[in-house]
Amino acid sequence: MKTCIRCTPLLLLLLLLSACAAAPKFDLSAGEIAAGEGLTTLHMPASDLPAPWTAEEEPGKWEAALAYAGIAFDASARADEEGTLKQVTLSADDDGSWAQADVDALVQALNADYGIELVPVVANGTVSLYAFQRNCNEITVTWTAGVSVSLTFQATTPLLPLLQEAQAAMAGEEVQP
């Protein structure tokens, strides 16, 4: 195969760029959670949560102290009635030392770890909300200046079956469970 002399630098540049692009560390489609010891995933049996998670008195709730992106968080996990993990929230108090740049750094860490692009829903300097959803699993980052910052991993309801069910009901068709 012949390569023109003009194309060679471009090919080398493309190879370098593709080699430098880091693969995502975590898979949101699989519900993987980027925090804590061991790999924790949404949809897993909550009884299998690894240390440092501890069960609380309230059924279906666990707590832990975790770190992510160099930030210390208090974390809580919630399970549904069947004991399946559905939500993990990491939160930290904001003593006034957080700024939009800190929130942006947290969002960038999540984007890099998951290979996603969290979308700003609200970002006005005192309240920021970013979100991303993939295959019924979502990540949200919420910051309220002077109050708290939180990071939530959550299993959500698939919308397509709900839309199909609503369309069938509107058409007067029998809805299949």
Regions found by a protein language model. Give the residues of each.
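Bacterial N-terminal signal peptides that target proteins for export
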Residues: 1-10
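Residue-level detector of functional hotspots within protein domains
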Residues: 6, 25-28, 63, 71-76, ...
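Short, surface-exposed loop and linker segments with low hydrophobicity and enrichment for Pro/Ser/Thr
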Residues: 7-8, 70, 75-84, 142-147
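Residue-level signal for mature regions of secreted extracellular proteins and peptides
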Residues: 13-14, 129
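C-terminal motif of bacterial Sec signal peptides marking the signal peptidase cleavage site
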Residues: 16-19
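Non-cytosolic coordination micro-motifs
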Residues: 23-59, 87-177
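Compositionally biased P/S/T/G-rich terminal and signal peptide-adjacent segments
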Residues: 51-52, 56-82
